[in-house]
Every structure is written in C-alpha cells, then in structure tokens.
C-alpha cells in the first residue's frame, strides 16, 4: 500500500515541483520585488527595528486578538520547525551543499512574498462571530478578487486542511520521536533500533499538549508562542555558533563549497546525482517548506494581530523569512557541512544527520540539548499549523467545525509518531505545492494592490507611524 502511495505521490510531486512550479514561485517573487521596489532591502532596517525592537513590548491587546509580536511568534512557530533541521539535512544529502545557495535565493525573494501576503491578510481580514480577526489567502482572494475567482479560496482552504495533517503535524512529531530516540541511544538508554513504545508514549503526550494549547483559543496560542519561540531560537543559535567557532578555519571553504555546489551539483556523499536543477529543486522546495513564503500560511497568524496598520505588520513578514531561512537554515547547513568528515550521509537522514553534526563537535552529551531544541521547534510548528487548519476549516464550514477539527488534529500526533519519515516528507512536499497554487495566482493578480500598499511604507515612515 505504501509503495502505491509513494508511486502516485512521486508522479504528482514531479509535476507540482517541476520546471513550471519553479518558474511560478521565483517569477511571482521577482514581480513583487520589482513592484515594491525591492522593499526587503530598502526597509530591512525598519523591519528589524519593528520586530526585534518589540520583543519586550507588553502592550495589552483587545479581546479576540494577539499582539503584533505574538502574531509573528505564532507565524514563526509555524515556520521555524523541522524544515530548518531535518529538511535542510535532507536537501544537502540529496541536492548537495549547493541546495543552501538556492535556499538563500528563495529566501531573498520570499521576504518580499511574505511581506505581500501579510500586508494583504491584514488589509482584507474580517471578524468572526466571536470577535476574532480572521484572515489569510482565503480572505484576500474572497475580498480582493471578483466572485469568479472565489473558487481559488475554497481550493486553498481544502488543500490547507489536507496539508496541516502532514506538514504541520505528522512530520513534526516524527522528528520529535526521532531526535528523542537518537538522544536515548547516544546515552545507551536504548539499544539498537528506535523503540516503538517510546514513540507511542511521546505521541500520546504530544497529542495531549497540543489539544490543551489549541483548545484554549487564540489567546493561549499567542501566549505559548511568544515564550517558546524566542527560547528555542536562542538555544539553537548558541549551539550552532559554537560549532562554527570551533571549526572557524574551515568556514570559508564550506561557503565556497555551497556556492560552487549550486552550479556543479554533487551530493554531500561525493557522488554525482543529477543536474543543477536537482540542487535548485531541493533548495527551493525545502526553503518554501521551511519559511512558507508563497504558501500564505503565515499570513493567517498575522491576521490575528491587534494592529490597524497592514504595512507595519507586513514588516514582520520580512523578518520572519530572514530569521527562518537566512539565519537558522544557514546555521543548520553549516553545522552539517563543517562536521562532514565525521558523518555518514548514507546512514543518517533528516534530524539524525543534524544531530550527528552537533555530536561530532561536542560529543554525545549535546544530543540532549539538540533533542530539546528540536522538540520545541516541532511542537511550536504543530501549534502554528493547528491555527492555520482551524481557520481553513472555519472558512469552509463555519465555527461549529473548529473544535472537532482540533480534536482530530491532536490525535494525528499519535499516528505521526510511528510513520515513515521519507514518505512523510515527500507527501508534505506535494501538498505544499498544491496549496501554493491558488495563493500564487492571487498574489499575481493582487500585485498592483501590493504596490499601492507598499508606497504607504515610505509615507508612514515620514509620518512617524512606522
């Protein structure tokens, strides 16, 4: 059965992530960059000031909303996940070091794409019966385009619901149990193969935590995210910087390897496995899986923000992609490549490959810290995507379906704890591509609107409101 699913998925994935998809994703990013006059560069300083500078802002929010910082933390909770760890490792193993270069290119354009998504989400959002702000691609399609295009909103929401179970939950739980098993085996608590009982126990525990947070509503999601995301990011950055400092003499060579590998692709194992397009495909697809620019998902969380300034919140989107891909994904890639002489890329995969990079430098004890970081990354992603899925199901069927959906979503954590990692990543890649289609069409058609809103950045800066 799994072989048949893998075969079908392979055909669909090849089409979704083929040349047309690469052209569409990169093309929309270039178009938005041109129409906003490269806002991710022009206003980068403003974006940093209005994100990092707001970390300790404790301004009270209205009921049914999050603070702007809670919103960006929730969006980062959804984006800073296993794509930064297991996804980058997989991209390097299959596409070579050059995949990181294509992640950078994807992120540069993605910063503008995410800015556009967030700005449109705030501009076209609505309030539901509970007084909560609701927005995202479904709503900027519905409220920004004519009725004949509204089927795209339904299409997006349907694939959004399907995507959250794999991308948002199952793959994340799989990485949690994988990293925990690796840590336990490094300390000889487990012998040989990963223990299925450990996987099941962690699956049940995670499911209970997920239900407790998500069923607590938008306020609880925001409160958990604003505490968890900064902690996990700082912990991971410190660990990664330690590896870089201890291997500082090899860093220039690794960067040269990344750039040259982008145009002469070669797997980290040393064997030629394809053309430049393979490296590009792996880098761009994993980059999108990681930062979600082009998927529109992060804008769903940003739409909950207690702000009346769409462009101001759009600045958070620039920071989000920068932090996710340029910082954390790059650090992951450097950790793996700097530890390359001590790692078997054939035997290790996903999270295990990243953990091997840390243990090769620090020793086996660090697997506990990396397991904690990965558990935080994955759990935060599950929470963020739970919000995305609930908004999609609310758009399709109304608020009465939200709580039943969240119960089912929580239960999927148990299922995901015992599934095959490789097939999970492949299926998630496919659903990501399908979800991006209606969003990219909407961004293309609303690019003129984005241009008008982007002009407000300069005016707002002159007026002192940003």
Model-derived regions: residue spans:
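Membrane-interface loop-to-helix entry segments
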Residues: 24-31, 35-48, 173-180, 197-247, ...
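Membrane-embedded translocation segments of transport machinery
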Residues: 216-219, 223-226, 231-298, 303, ...
């Amino acid at each position: 059965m799994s072989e048949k699913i893998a075969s079908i998925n392979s055909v669909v994935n090849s089409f979704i992530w083929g040349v047309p998809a690469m052209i569409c994703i990169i093309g929309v990013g270039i178009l938005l960059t041109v129409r906003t006059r490269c806002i991710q560069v022009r206003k980068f300083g403003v974006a940093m000031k209005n994100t990092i500078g707001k970390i300790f802002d404790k301004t009270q929010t209205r009921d049914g909303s999050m603070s702007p910082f809670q919103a960006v933390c929730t969006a980062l909770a959804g984006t800073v996940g296993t794509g930064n760890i297991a996804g980058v490792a997989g991209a390097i193993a299959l596409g070579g070091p050059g995949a990181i270069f294509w992640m950078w290119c994807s992120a540069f354009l993605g910063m503008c794409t995410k800015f556009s998504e967030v700005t449109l989400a705030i501009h076209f959002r609505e309030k539901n019966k509970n007084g909560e702000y609701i927005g995202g691609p479904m709503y900027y399609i519905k409220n920004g385009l004519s009725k004949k295009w509204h089927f795209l909103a339904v299409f997006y929401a349907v694939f959004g619901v399907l995507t959250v179970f794999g991308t948002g939950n199952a793959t994340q739980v799989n990485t949690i149990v994988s990293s925990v098993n690796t840590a336990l085996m490094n300390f000889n608590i487990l012998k040989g193969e990963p223990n299925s009982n450990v996987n099941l126990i962690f699956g049940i525990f995670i499911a209970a935590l997920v239900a407790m947070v998500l069923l607590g509503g938008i306020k609880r999601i925001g409160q958990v995210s604003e505490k968890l995301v900064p902690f996990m990011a700082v912990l991971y950055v410190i660990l990664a910087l330690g590896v870089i400092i201890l291997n500082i003499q090899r860093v220039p060579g690794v960067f040269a390897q990344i750039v040259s590998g982008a145009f002469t692709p070669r797997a980290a194992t040393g064997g030629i496995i394809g053309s430049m397009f393979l490296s590009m495909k792996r880098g761009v697809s994993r980059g999108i899986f990681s930062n979600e620019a082009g998927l529109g998902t992060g804008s769903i969380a940003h739409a909950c923000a207690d702000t009346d300034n769409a462009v101001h919140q759009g600045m958070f989107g620039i920071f989000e992609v920068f932090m996710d891909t340029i910082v954390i994904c790059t650090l992951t890639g450097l950790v793996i490549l700097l530890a390359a002489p001590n790692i078997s890329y054939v035997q290790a995969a996903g999270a295990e490959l990243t953990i091997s990079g840390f243990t090769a430098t620090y020793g086996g004890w660090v697997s506990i810290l990396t397991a904690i970081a990965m558990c935080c990354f994955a759990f935060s992603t599950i929470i963020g995507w739970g919000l995305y899925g609930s908004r999609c199901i609310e758009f399709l069927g109304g608020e009465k379906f939200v709580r039943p959906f969240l119960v089912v979503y929580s239960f999927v954590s148990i299922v995901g704890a015992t599934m095959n990692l490789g097939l999970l990543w492949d299926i998630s890649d496919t659903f990501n591509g399908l979800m991006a289609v209606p969003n990219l069409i909407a961004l293309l058609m609303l690019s003129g609107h984005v241009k008008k809103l982007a002009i407000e950045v300069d005016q707002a800066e002159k007026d002192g409101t940003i």
